[in-house]
Every structure is written in structure tokens, then in C-alpha cells.
Amino acid sequence: MPSFHNTITIGHRPNGDSKRTTYLVTGASRGIGKGLVASFLARPDSTVIACVRNVASQSKALSDLPCAEGSSLIVVKLDCAVETDPASAVEELQSAHNIRHIDVVVANAAIAGAYGPTSTLPLDAVKEHMQINCYSVLLLFQATRPLLEQAAPGKAKFVFIGAPISTITQMEECARAPLGAYGLTKLAANYLVRKFHFENKWLMSFVIDPGHVQTDMGDSGARLMGRKEAPTTLQQSVDGICARIDEATKEESSGQFLLHEDGSRLPW
């Protein structure tokens, strides 16, 4: 199995072929991120780049995922808490793996913590959430933009996995959730992703609400609200996200906040 500094390749060796579909997913070691990696790997002639915090300890679970004919998995270090990691990861993808274009970037990595009312919310916690949930999205876009530009015309997509708690219009529905730092920083990232849409006419850039998903993060949030678990299964969420990505167009999807289930638009 070929390996490089902070990266591992499994399956068909990428050769820079522009006809292959190349996906990049952050937060890929578990939950929605891992589910998306598995789904994309099941598609023939795909290169799937799974971004994780620690390649040595987190690549095994990903390397066991089945690959379709002609598809390959690249596991690369990208810790969203490290400001230089997005640029370093892209540099390594180009130099060590001959990645010449990316068709779809999914900014999925996120944290949710510092539970409690905003009256006692520590500023340090806000800063930590802002780095992971917002600043890293900007840095990821800046790092991957040149490779997105090399995708086939009308194919490049930058997708942010958002959260319904970030909507201002419908805040009353989620107001009792003690997730001020999470909601605030997801909201800030929404602005950036919509801004990418307006500033880059060649790019589809949009937010997908994945639902309240049965992941470690989702179930923790559910318990805070007195529920046993989140209502949306991981597979339901992943299937919906993939469908929204596949059907996306510049005219109908880009610059929007879309529900994973049916693509309906959510208010900002």
C-alpha cells in the first residue's frame, strides 16, 4: 500500500485523469463524513480524498471501506484547528498524488460544545468553535479553489454541511437548545458559503442541512433536549446529501440553504 508523509492511498492509483470524479470530504473519520466517503467510493472511477486529523490512527476504518471499479481512496491529514493544514493538504495532494482537479469539496468537519446559555458562554469557547466551524471553511475554500477551477465547466461544487440551528428566521424553534457557540459559528460560515456563490460565477456553492442525525454529535444534542437519540438516521442523511449534490445546478441550488430530504430551501 503506497504511503506518503501524512497521506495514505488505497485502491486505483490516481493519475490526474480529468474524466475521473474527485471528491474531498473533511471530518471524514466518522459520522456524516465517513458516510459520505463510503458513498462516493461506491461510485466507479472516483477519487475520494478523506481528510482526517490523524492519518495513522484514523485511516484503518476508512481503508476497510469497499471501492468500486477504478476508484481510490486518499486519506490525508487536515486538522481544521491548524490554520496551515488546508494549504498543506492540497500541496501534498498535488505533489504526492498527482491531483490536478477537484469536482466536489464537502466542508463537513465541525465541533459542538460549551453547552449553556449565552450569558455564561466563555469567549475562548466561541473562538475555538469559530476556528473549526467557520475559519477552516474559508481556509479550505481558499486552498481548494485552484483545483475546483480545473473541474469540467459547470461541475465544480463547494458544499457546506450546515445546521438548522443556524437560521435566524426560525431561531425561535431552536431557541432553547444550549448551543450558542455552535449556532453562531455555523451562521458565520453560511455567510461565507453564500458569498463564494456570488463571487465565483463558475462555482456552485451551497449549504445543506443534514437533519438532526444519529451521530455522536447529533445524539449528544438530542439528550440535551431530553430525547434518547436524534431522529434522522445516518444513512438517510448521507443519501439525501448525495442526492442534493448530484442534482445541484448554479441556477437552483447555488447560494441556497437546502434541506437534505428534498432540496427545499430553508430561510437564512
Swiss-Prot record:
Pfam families assigned to the protein according to its UniProt record, in alphabetical order: adh_short
The protein, known as: Norsolorinic acid ketoreductase nor1
GO MF annotation: an example: norsolorinic acid ketoreductase activity
Family listed: Belongs to the short-chain dehydrogenases/reductases (SDR) family.
Disulfide bonds: none
Keywords from the UniProt entry: Cytoplasm, NADP, Oxidoreductase, Vacuole
Catalysed reactions, semicolon-separated: (1'S)-averantin + NADP(+) = norsolorinic acid + NADPH + H(+)
E.C. no: 1.1.1.349
Chief location of this protein within or outside the cell: cytoplasm
Function field: Norsolorinic acid ketoreductase; part of the fragmented gene cluster that mediates the biosynthesis of dothistromin (DOTH), a polyketide toxin very similar in structure to the aflatoxin precursor, versicolorin B. The first step of the pathway is the conversion of acetate to norsolorinic acid (NOR) and requires the fatty acid synthase subunits hexA and hexB, as well as the polyketide synthase pksA. PksA combines a hexanoyl starter unit and 7 malonyl-CoA extender units to synthesize the precursor NOR.
GO cellular component: cytosol; vacuole
Pathway the protein acts in: Mycotoxin biosynthesis
Keyword Cytoplasm among UniProt keywords: yes
Triggers of expression: Expression is positively regulated by the dothistromin-specific transcription factor aflR.
Subcellular locations according to the entry: Cytoplasm, Cytosol; Vacuole
Residues at which NADP(+) binds: 32, 79, 108, 182, 186, 213, 215
